[in-house]
Structure formats: structure tokens, C-alpha cells
Amino acid sequence: MKVLSAAVLSLVGAAAYAGPITTVPWNGHPGAVSFTFDDSEISQLNNLGDYFEKNQDIKVTFFMTGGMNAGNQSKYFPMAEKGHEIGNHSKTHADLTNSNNLKGEITDYKYDLEQRSGAEVVAFATPYCYYNDAVEAEIAKAHIVNRNCQGATKYKWNEEPVWERISSDCYQGNTQQSKGNMSEAKQKNAWTVQLNHGVDGAGFGYGITPSDMISIMDEAKAQGLWRAPMGRVAAYYRAHFVIDKAEATSIDGGFKVTWKSPHSAMPKSVPLRVNIEGAEGKTVKQKGKEIQPEDDGAFVIEFMDLELEVVGAAPASSSSEALPESSSDVIASSDATVPTSSADVPTSSTTAIAQDLQWASQEPTTFAVFSVTGVLVKSFVATTQSAEGSFKALQIPHGTYYLKDLKSNYIRKVVK
């Protein structure tokens, strides 16, 4: 045995823990779908209004343009108060790739819609689905997502898309294809976007009958999909790629996680369903307000608060007592020992832990897991007999670590 060098121990510094927050995919559903309706064709409200009233679990996006049916827009604005979305479809519905006024067509019209509707406008839809680099750059200035129509792409949870090129399935008479998109989204645990125009069966081949439209939306419900507006799903999706990477830092009596908004045009409120490692039995707070867990143990937090605190231990796989408040508490002793020979180090498991007589205590104790460079990775409470299983259960990368018994101060080299 030898003493772990002071140089290694000094590397711990201020404790930091990676990724204690994990977003629940698609708000707790097996997939998501956004139904979008273009051009303020009044048949959309006339023929689907009752359906939306009776089915409050579906919310859609209405993309509006000043170039088509602008006189109907005021009839759509109250839908935003009911949870539906007002989206930007450009000022004149022109081919934007040939426009010399992209700011007026895209950004200025967004603010015009917001002023008249009182709603946040965060999603854009390119007219005719025509775009180029200049169009995308202008869209990205004030919108978090853009819809085009290159087909029913299925966007998987952990694969970040190009936000200015979210493709959709433009309905052209094939109801069975649209229904198939719903089952495929569930199968792939993915998000898909549907594009519709008139809901009266007319519309130069782009219209759909009310019964067919309702049957597609009902199919989405039958598949268990999250049926939410495009901007809302995009905000949830974008938030996931940020918050799941956010690191926690130790604070007095617990830990704090902070993150940044991925875009200046994010909605003012982005409710996010998350799991928080190390929060069981602790108090979760945002801006001083306590967040109660849901029945399944998840938390619905406000992403746009950009921070979260857990009063209690730092993230751990299990804990029945408070963890050390700082890394200096964890490694206060300089006589901690580690094995000196490879024979003492397990090559594929931690079975050697229980074999060491120095680790024979039956009493629960706190174990700290360090990287080989001395960085504190995780902590957990266990007896020496259960330490092996607890260590294996940790969600950390495979590799070599040092496992320290904080009661005896012994350190053991282990492999996951």
C-alpha cells in the first residue's frame, strides 16, 4: 500500500458534478407530433373548432401570412389564449429566395404579428418551402425553429436537428400515409410535423376533409403522442440539449445547476419535465420557489429560470445522509491508501472491495468516487458488502476510478 499523492488530491478543487438533470423525452410521451395549418383558411376554425374544444390535450400551430386571408387573422388570435400557437408565414407569402427585403418579410412581420395578437411568435414556416442560406440566417435571428416540407422526417430525441430545416409532411390526399407517420413516430420515439391547408376537401389538392383531419389527429392520440404546437415542441427539444449537459456545483447544504438559453427568441416560459439525480428526499427550488415531485418522481421545472437548486447532498445514486459539503471534506485525510500492485486492482469488477479486511465494516458509510486524476465524480452511501453493486449502478463512463471509504479513509482502485 502507498499514500495517494498530494498532487492527485489537490486536483479535486471545487467539486463539480456532471449532468444531474435528465429531460424526460417528449414530455413523457413515446413521441411527438405538431399539426400545423397555413394561410388562415377559415375552414380550419369552422370545421375543427368544436374538436379542439372537446380535446384539450391537442394544441396546434396556425402559420399566418399577410399575403393570404389576412382578414381572417383576428379570428385566430384568441386561439393563442387557449394554448394554440400563432406562427409566422412571412409578410407577403413570396418566394423568399428572390426577396430583397428579408428583414421585412421575416423579422419585422414576426413583431407585427406579436403586437396584433398579443402572442409570442417563435416559429416560422417558409412560403412554398423555398429557402437558402440568407433566408435561414434571417429566420434564425428571431425564431427558434423553421418548418419546410421535404417530407415526414422523424426527429429522434438525442439527435439535434438543424433548427432552420425542420421538415414536414405536406398533406396531398393520402390520409393513410399521414396516419402511418403517427405510428412511425411512436416506433422511433421521435417528433414529426404535419402540414395542412384548408379543412374542407378543396384547395388545389392540398385540402383535407374534416373527418380525415380528425381521424389523423385521433390516430396520434391513439399512439400516445404528445400533440403540441411546433414552437412548444421545438423549445422543449432545444432545452433538452442544453440542460442535460449542465453541470452542478456544490453549495451550502446541496448543489446548484445553472445553464444558458439556447436562443434569444426562446419562449418566456418553457416547462420541462425532468429527472434529477440526487433529489430524492431533498428540496428542489427555482428562484426560491419549491418544486414538488410528480407522482412518478419527475419534476416539472421552468427551463427559462436558467438555474435550479437541490438542498441536500450532491448528486448520488443513493443517499441516506448528507454528503461532504466540499471536496476538502471528502479528502481531508492525507493517509488514504491505495493498492500498489496490479494484483490488488480488479480488472473487470469491484469484487476485491469486500475481500479486503480493511473494508469489512457492516455499518453504512459514505463512499466517494474519484477519477484517476483526483476529480470527485460521485458519492453514495452503502455498506462494504453493497458497495460493489452501488458502484456498478452509477451512471458514469466505464474506466478506472478510485473509491474512497470516508469513514476509514481507505482508497481502493476500481474498474467499471
Question: What positions do the PLM features span?
Answer:
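Metal-dependent polysaccharide deacetylase catalytic core of the NodB/CE4 family, i.e.
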Residues: 30-33, 42-43, 54-145, 149-166, ...
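C-terminal domain-boundary segment and adjacent tail
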Residues: 19-25, 55, 60, 68-71, ...
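Ser/Thr/Gly/Pro-rich low-complexity, disordered linker/stalk segments of secreted
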Residues: 314-351
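N-terminal pre-catalytic segment of deacetylase/amide-hydrolase enzymes
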Residues: 3-35, 43, 47, 210, ...
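C-terminal tail/sorting-segment detector
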Residues: 3, 379, 398-416
